[in-house]
Design a protein with these regions (language model features):
Chain B
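Inter-helical junctions in multi-pass inner-membrane proteins, predominant
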Residues: 1-12, 159-164, 193-231, 256-264
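Alpha-helical transmembrane segments within multi-pass membrane transporters and channels
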Residues: 56-102, 109, 244-249, 253, ...
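Helix-loop-helix "hairpin" substructures at the membrane interface of multi-pass membrane proteins
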Residues: 133, 137-215, 239-245
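Membrane-embedded helix boundary and interhelical linker motif in transport proteins
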Residues: 7, 29-76, 80, 259
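Membrane-interfacial amphipathic/re-entrant helices at transmembrane-helix boundaries
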Residues: 1-19, 47, 59-62, 88-94, ...
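Short, non-helical or kinked segments that cap or interrupt transmembrane helices
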Residues: 14, 25-45, 59, 89-93, ...
Length: 380, 293
C-alpha cells in the first residue's frame, strides 16, 4: 500500500513537506476496485477545482497541495489512509471516502483527531451524526425523493401510485423506505406494492397486477439493469403511466437499455449536465476540455466541495499550530454558502446519536427531470 | 387480468421449458448435471448480439450464428471435459464440478471482454408488434417463444421415440456398455448429444435475450437455478417433463404474484417443487428404476 501511495505522489507531482506556504489537503477516494468508477470521477473533480483555484491566486496567496490516496472502497483501507493523511502527512482537512460504508468506519478516526472530514459522495443516513467534524455536500435520497414525488404529483396530478422495488438489494430497499415515507408525508395512496429480485428478467406478472389496480403512476426503486427492462415490458403491456424513479434510475444508461420506451420517467438529482446555470456551464466546459468527456454527478459534487472548503480557508488566519488551524477551519466551514455546478448550497447541522448537534449535511434543491425522446428534460 | 396473466404464464413457462430441454437431455443421456448450461445459454445470446451488431445480419441468421457458436462450445465441452472424464471412469460428481469451473471461467472471460453491463439488441431487429385481443396484449415474440418451445420438444420426442438415433440414444441412456456391444457408436452419440443440447441452450439464450431485451454475463445464473427446478419437477432426463415442468413453474410464479404477492413468488414456487418431490420423488414423469432419454 505504501508503494501505491508513493506512486500517486510521483504521478501527481506532490511531495510532502515542501515549502511552508502551502495548504495540505488530504484526498482519500476509491481509485481502484469496484467503487473506482465513482472515486476516479471524484478525483478529477477535485483536481479541476484545485487547478482553477491555484491559477486564480490560490488561498490568499498560499498554494493548495493535494495529497491523494487510494482507499480502494474498503473500510479497513480507508481507516489506514485516514491515519496516514492525518498523522503523517499532517493535512489541514480530509476529503472522502467514496462509499458510505467506508465513511461509517473511517470518519470516527478524523473526528477523534479533530480534523474536518468532508464527504462528497456519502448518502447513507447517520454519517454526519458521527460528530461535529464530519461534513458532506452530497444530498441524500431522503431529501431528493420527496422533491421528485412532489414535482411529479404537481405536473401529472397523480394521487395514487403502485410501488415496484427490488427487495434483495440494500440500495433499492433503502430507496424504497424513503419513497414509502415520502408517499405517507405527501398523502399519496398506494394501490399495491410489488417486488422483484436481482437477476429477474420477466416482470410482466407484477406489471399486469399493477395495471389491474389502476394507479396514476408507478414508483420504481430499481437499478438500471432491472429498471430499464421493467419500463420496456410495461410499455409492451400497454401501460403508459409515468414512472417515478429513485437515484438508481438516474442514469443515461436508461436511454440505451430502454430506448424508445424510456419516456415519462421522473427522477431527481442534485446535479444535471443539462442545468443551464452559468457556474455549471463553466464547469462542464472546463471538465470536457481537461478530460474529453462529459462529467458526472460525482465529479460535480467534488468540484463544488473543493470550492466550499476554499471559501472557509480564505477566512482563516493561519497560525504555526496545526491543531489550532484545523479547529479554526471547522468553525469557519458551517457558515459557507456557495453557488457552484450543483446550484445554491449551504450546510445544515445534523443531530448526533446522543441527540446533540453533530456534523453538517447539505441543503440543496433537487433538480427534477423527466425523460422525453431519450433525454432528460428539467422540470421547474 | 387473469387472461393476461395466463399469457404471461405461458410465455414465461415456454422460456423455462426451452432452457430445461438441453439441460435435461445432457442429464438423460450423458448422466451429467451440466452446470455450464447457463454459461452456454449466455454465450448464445452474446453470439447473436455480436452477429447483429458487427455483421448487421437480421435475427434468423443471428440465431443460426448462435447455434453454430454454442454447438462448437458443446463440442469443446465434450472433448475437453466429458470424454476424458468418461474415459477415466471419474465418479459422478467430477463432471458436475468441472462444469462449475467451466461456467465461472467462461462468465469471467465474457465479463472481461464485453464488460459486465447490460447490452441490448438494436430496436429495429426486434419484432415489436403486439396483438391486442380484448384487454390482453400478446407480443409476437411471446407467441414465437411458446410455439418454438413446443415445436422443438415435439421434434425431440419424435426423434427419441421413432428414429433409429432415438433408439440408440435410449439404449445409451440405459447402459453405455450394452449399447456399445450392440454396435452403437457410443463416443459419437455422446458428442452429438452434448452439441445438440448446447445448441438448444444457445438458441434459448437468444430467445430469452430478445424477450427481455438484455444481455449480460451473469444472465445464465438465475436461469440455471430455475432450470434445475424445472428438470427436477418434470423428472430428471425426461423431455416431456422439461415441457410440463417449465410451464408448471411459469404458472406457479405468475399466479403467486397475481393472487398472493410478489414477495412470496420464489417461496411458493419452490415450496411447490418441494411438495412435488415429497409426493413423487422422481418428479412428475420420472420413474426411479428406469431412465429415459
Amino acid at each position: 500500500m505504501r508503494c501505491r501511495a508513493l506512486l500517486f505522489i510521483l504521478v501527481f507531482g506532490v511531495l510532502p513537506n515542501t515549502a511552508a506556504a502551502q495548504i495540505k489537503i488530504g484526498i482519500a477516494e476509491a481509485l481502484t476496485g469496484n467503487a473506482s468508477q465513482y472515486g476516479v470521477a471524484i478525483r478529477k473533480g477535485f483536481e479541476l477545482a484545485a487547478g482553477e483555484i491555484a491559477s486564480s491566486g490560490g488561498i490568499n496567496g498560499q498554494k493548495l497541495e493535494l495529497v491523494i490516496e487510494d482507499e480502494q472502497g474498503k473500510k479497513e483501507e480507508a481507516i489506514n489512509v485516514f491515519k496516514k493523511l492525518i498523522f503523517q502527512d499532517k493535512v489541514l482537512l480530509l476529503f472522502g471516502p467514496t462509499l458510505s460504508n467506508s465513511a461509517q468506519a473511517a470518519d470516527p478516526v478524523a473526528q477523534a483527531a479533530k480534523v474536518v472530514v468532508f464527504g462528497t459522495s456519502n448518502t447513507a443516513d447517520g454519517i454526519t451524526s458521527i460528530g461535529n467534524y464530519v461534513f458532506r455536500n452530497s444530498v441524500t435520497e431522503a431529501d431528493i425523493l420527496p422533491a421528485t414525488l412532489k414535482v411529479a404529483a404537481q405536473k401529472t396530478g397523480l394521487s395514487k401510485v403502485a410501488v415496484l422495488y427490488g427487495n434483495d438489494d440494500i440500495f433499492t430497499r433503502s430507496s424504497y423506505d424513503n419513497f414509502k415515507k415520502a408517499l405517507q408525508d405527501l398523502k399519496i395512496g398506494v394501490t399495491t406494492t410489488e417486488t422483484f429480485a436481482k437477476g429477474d428478467v420477466d416482470f410482466k406478472p407484477q406489471l399486469t397486477k399493477i395495471k389491474g389496480t389502476n394507479p396514476d403512476a408507478i414508483v420504481l426503486s430499481a437499478l438500471v439493469a432491472e429498471g430499464a427492462p421493467i419500463m420496456v415490458q410495461a410499455r409492451q403491456l400497454g401501460i403508459t403511466l409515468p414512472f417515478v424513479g429513485g437515484n438508481g434510475m438516474n442514469s443515461p444508461r436508461v436511454f440505451e437499455l430502454a430506448r424508445d420506451h424510456s419516456d415519462n420517467l421522473w427522477v431527481g438529482s442534485p446535479w444535471s449536465v443539462e442545468s443551464s446555470a452559468p457556474e455549471n456551464k463553466r464547469f462542464v466546459a472546463a471538465y470536457q476540455k481537461a478530460h474529453g468527456a462529459l462529467p458526472d454527478q460525482f465529479a460535480a459534487q467534488a468540484y463544488d466541495a473543493m470550492y466550499i472548503a476554499a471559501q472557509a480557508m480564505r477566512k482563516l488566519k493561519f497560525a504555526a499550530n496545526l491543531d489550532a488551524d484545523r479547529r479554526a477551519l471547522r468553525d469557519a466551514l458551517p457558515a459557507v454558502q456557495w453557488s457552484g455546478a450543483t446550484g445554491p448550497f449551504k450546510f445544515r447541522q445534523a443531530t448526533g446519536r446522543d441527540g446533540k448537534p453533530a456534523g453538517y449535511d447539505a441543503v440543496q434543491t433537487a433538480i427534477v427531470m423527466v425523460t422525453k425522446r431519450n433525454q432528460y428534460v428539467i422540470q421547474k | 387480468m387473469l387472461a393476461q396473466q395466463i399469457i404471461n404464464g405461458l410465455s414465461l413457462g415456454g422460456v423455462y421449458a426451452l432452457f430445461a430441454l438441453g439441460f435435461t437431455l445432457v442429464f438423460g443421456v450423458l448422466n451429467v448435471i451440466n452446470l455450464a448450461h447457463g454459461a452456454i445459454f449466455m454465450i448464445g445470446a452474446y453470439a447473436a448480439l455480436h452477429a447483429v451488431l458487427v455483421f448487421h445480419v437480421s435475427l434468423l441468421p443471428a440465431i443460426f450464428v448462435a447455434a453454430l457458436v454454442t454447438g462448437g462450445a458443446g463440442w469443446i465441452l465434450d472433448k475437453l471435459i466429458f470424454a476424458p472424464l468418461r474415459a477415466s471412469r471419474a465418479p459422478h460428481l467430477a463432471p458436475m464440478i468441472a462444469t462449475i469451473g467451466v461456467s465461472i471461467c467462461v462468465t469471467s472471460l465474457i465479463e472481461g471482454y464485453f464488460g459486465s453491463e447490460n447490452l441490448r439488441f438494436p430496436l429495429d431487429t426486434l419484432p415489436s408488434s403486439t396483438l391486442t385481443l380484448a384487454s390482453v396484449q400478446v407480443n409476437w415474440l411471446d407467441v414465437k417463444i411458446i410455439v418454438l418451445a413446443l415445436l422443438l420438444m415435439g421434434g425431440m420426442l419424435w426423434v427419441i421415440r421413432h428414429s433409429s438415433t432415438g433408439r440408440a440414444l435410449r439404449a445409451l441412456a440405459e447402459s453405455p456398455k450394452a449399447a456399445a456391444l450392440l454396435g452403437v457408436n457410443v463416443g459419437g452419440l455422446f458428442l452429438a448429444t452434448s452439441v445438440i443440447a448446447s445448441i438448444l441452450g444457445g438458441v434459448s439464450g437468444v430467445l430469452i435475450a430478445l424477450y427481455t431485451n438484455s444481455v449480460f454475463p451473469h444472465m445464465g445464473q438465475p436461469m440455471l437455478h430455475k432450470g434445475i427446478a424445472v428438470v427436477i419437477i418434470g423428472g430428471m432426463g425426461d423431455v416431456r417433463g422439461a415441457l410440463i415442468g417449465g410451464f408448471f413453474l411459469g404458472f406457479a410464479e405468475v399466479l403467486t404474484i397475481a393472487y398472493i404477492g410478489s414477495n412470496m413468488r420464489d417461496a411458493v414456487a419452490f415450496g411447490l417443487l418441494f411438495s412435488v418431490l415429497l409426493l413423487r420423488p422422481a418428479g412428475l414423469f420420472g420413474q426411479a428404476p428406469q431412465r429415459r432419454a
